[in-house]
């Protein structure tokens, strides 16, 4: 090292010597006046000039000086300094070159020779010093800046799936991902949608636009029967309807399109979710009651099993099952159940007790009634009446008492596309009724030998989906694909309870996540696992710089990255099949949507059709009258049921004792 330093010092001395020679030769007359010329030097320089022509131009000695200066700087190891930048080096070097090489004209200025010489020597020296500084700074510059990748992007980028893997069930989304300092094209291949899918993301992250809409379109193209819960009706419904019109060729049997919409009965089919033909056991009535009551009282989800939670559920279940067995289920509708519940409880209990299959079911109520525990009884009944009273609506009664279609949407002989619309302004009312449709559909479609089907629930926490965890766990073998969209896991835990929320999180095979924060981001980061990453550290002291490189396991996609995803950027993982292996299941990419194509398609969309025309022969709109007449008819039918049943019980010697005499 010392030998190298001596060589570099020698080269720098030679460089300075050439500068001195340049000044001596081209400023000779002035130097002679100053008395600093020497005859020996003059002879040596004249000999060089005769043999080499070294001084034929002012540039040659300058070039030799710069060459030796550069060599001396290259071989010099300076103390590294973070504050030295290429910008400073470039500025110093540029100034040095200008001052050092472009100053020959100063010798020709119309000034005294002494002045010309002073200016020339000053600029030459300043230029040389600037170039010397630039060269020295180069040797002290940190060649590898550890702060070039402050967000660790290179370490956390990885190769993703670039193959398009399709089958008759798959959903395939084109992507762009960053890897090895460039953007690459790839694919997210959901080759097994029957293992359920989750789409997470804060509002505006693009989960509906990039994922949910694509699921709807591709599954319709591939002939799926479809059930879609449309929280912001008719956004998803219009997509499903128009895409079906353009892709009917994907179905062996042409499917029918059905709508449930409580806001506008003109654009809604009618369907009875507790149709007697689909209720074979009192357990079905209990499931329906359970779904309704927990949708109306979300706080009960975490209190399942409590006395004042189970009591109203059992009471409503008994009423539903009574309507199922009364006259063959002629009046078995949810509006009839609400109206019957709101009759005098003495009459209701008397009627229900007259049926042996309901007598034991109602024993808690009957015990309280017969022991005159009025406060307890009133509390039990009020727990059922008060929430259900919010659902008393002529429009809701109209939709839920008809039978335009059945809920077995994946019946191979009658496939259906069913969309149900909610309204954020009336969510608390509509969610309970729609939850009933959900629970009935889940039970009817999750069977062997049916058509492949899809259940798409966007904004899942706005509705309580009874049996969802069981559907995810068992639907795969029955070809039922489930897609759930919501904002984050904390929202799901709040509305579904901790236990059910964890089951849903841990049993879903395909996960898409846009921007999410907090615990959800941490959970997802842990799910994606860790990868071996390279770490580089640098130590700088007065004498030298040392660099060490190590590896360690770190998060493939940290929670901080998930918390700051741009709109349209998603992280996630997919599940594969035995015969369709996907080595890299995890993705961190932008889901590519052809915006121009979407705009063109949307521009051609037609509005959802009008289902029922309430116009009479004279052209008058009779919707309100017909809906009100249906409402009044239901109430009258329930009054008549109570009267007929009480009369029957009074006239039956074996049952007349059930009628409690009023004091």
Residue ranges and their predicted role:
Residues 70-76, 435, 439, 510, ...:
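Hydrophobic alpha-helical segments involved in membrane association or supramolecular assembly
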Residues 472-474, 478-575:
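Conserved ATP-driven motor cores of ASCE-family P-loop NTPases powering translocation/secretion/packaging/pilus
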Residues 586-589:
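N-terminal charged/capping segments associated with class I S-adenosyl-L-methionine
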Residues 22, 32, 36, 142-147, ...:
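P-loop NTPase motor domains
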């Amino acid at each position: 090292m010392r030998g190298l330093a001596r060589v570099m010092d020698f080269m720098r001395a030679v460089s300075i010597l050439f500068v001195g020679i340049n000044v001596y030769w081209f400023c000779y007359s002035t130097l002679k006046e100053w008395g600093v010329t020497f005859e020996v030097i003059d002879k040596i320089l004249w000999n060089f000039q005769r043999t080499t022509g070294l001084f034929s131009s002012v540039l040659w000695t300058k070039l030799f000086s710069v060459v030796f200066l550069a060599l001396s700087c290259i071989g010099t190891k300076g103390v590294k300094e973070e504050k030295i930048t290429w910008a400073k080096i470039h500025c110093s070097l540029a100034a040095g070159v200008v001052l050092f090489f472009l100053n020959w004209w100063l010798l020709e200025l119309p000034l005294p020779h002494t002045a010309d010489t002073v200016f020339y020597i000053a600029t030459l020296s300043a230029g040389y010093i600037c170039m010397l500084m630039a060269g020295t700074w180069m040797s002290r510059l940190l060649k590898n800046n550890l702060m070039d990748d402050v967000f660790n992007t290179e370490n956390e980028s990885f190769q993703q799936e670039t193959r398009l893997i399709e089958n008759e069930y798959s959903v395939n989304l084109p992507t762009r991902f960053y890897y090895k300092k460039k953007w690459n094209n790839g694919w997210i291949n959901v080759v097994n949608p029957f293992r359920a899918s989750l789409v997470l993301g804060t509002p505006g992250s693009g989960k509906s636009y990039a994922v949910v809409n694509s699921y709807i379109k591709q599954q319709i193209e591939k002939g799926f029967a479809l059930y879609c819960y449309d929280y912001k009706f008719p956004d998803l419904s219009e997509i499903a309807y128009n895409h079906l019109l353009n892709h009917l060729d994907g179905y062996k049997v042409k499917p029918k399109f059905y709508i449930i919409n409580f806001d506008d009965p003109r654009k809604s089919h009618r369907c009875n979710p507790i149709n007697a033909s689909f209720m074979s056991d009192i357990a079905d009535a209990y499931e329906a009651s359970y779904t309704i009551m927990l949708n109306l009282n979300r706080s009960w989800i975490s209190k399942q099993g409590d006395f004042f939670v189970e009591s109203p559920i059992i009471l409503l279940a008994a009423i539903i099952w009574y309507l199922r067995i009364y006259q063959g289920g002629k009046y078995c509708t949810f509006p009839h159940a609400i109206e019957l519940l709101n009759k005098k409880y003495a009459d209701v209990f008397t009627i229900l007790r007259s049926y042996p299959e309901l007598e034991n079911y109602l024993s808690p109520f009957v015990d309280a009634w017969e022991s005159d525990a009025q406060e307890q009884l009133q509390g039990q009944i009020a727990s059922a009446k008060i929430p259900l009273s919010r659902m008393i609506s002529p429009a809701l009664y109209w939709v839920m008492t008809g039978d335009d279609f059945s809920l077995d949407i994946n019946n191979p002989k009658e496939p259906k596309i069913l969309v149900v619309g909610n309204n954020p302004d009336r969510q608390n009312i509509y969610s309970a009724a729609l939850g009933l449709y959900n629970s009935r559909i889940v039970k009817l479609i999750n069977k062997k030998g049916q058509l492949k089907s899809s259940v798409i629930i966007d904004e899942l926490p706005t509705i309580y989906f009874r049996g969802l965890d069981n559907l995810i766990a068992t639907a795969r073998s029955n070809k039922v694909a489930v897609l759930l969209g919501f904002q984050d896991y904390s929202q799901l835990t709040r509305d579904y309870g901790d236990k059910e929320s964890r089951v849903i999180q841990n049993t879903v095979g395909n996960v898409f996540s846009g921007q999410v924060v907090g615990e959800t981001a941490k959970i997802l980061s842990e799910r994606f696992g860790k990868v071996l990453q390279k770490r580089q550290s640098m130590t700088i002291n007065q004498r030298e710089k040392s660099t060490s490189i190590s590896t360690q396991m770190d998060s493939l996609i940290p929670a901080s990255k998930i918390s700051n995803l741009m709109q349209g950027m998603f992280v996630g993982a997919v599940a594969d099949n035995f015969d369709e292996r996907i080595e890299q299941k995890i993705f961190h990419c932008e889901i590519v949507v052809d915006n121009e194509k979407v705009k063109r398609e949307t521009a051609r969309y037609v509005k959802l059709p009008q289902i029922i025309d309430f116009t009479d022969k004279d052209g008058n709109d009779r919707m309100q009258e017909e809906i009100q007449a249906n409402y009044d008819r239901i109430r009258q039918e329930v009054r008549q049921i109570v009267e007929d049943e009480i009369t029957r019980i009074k006239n039956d010697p074996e049952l007349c004792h059930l009628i409690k005499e009023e004091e």
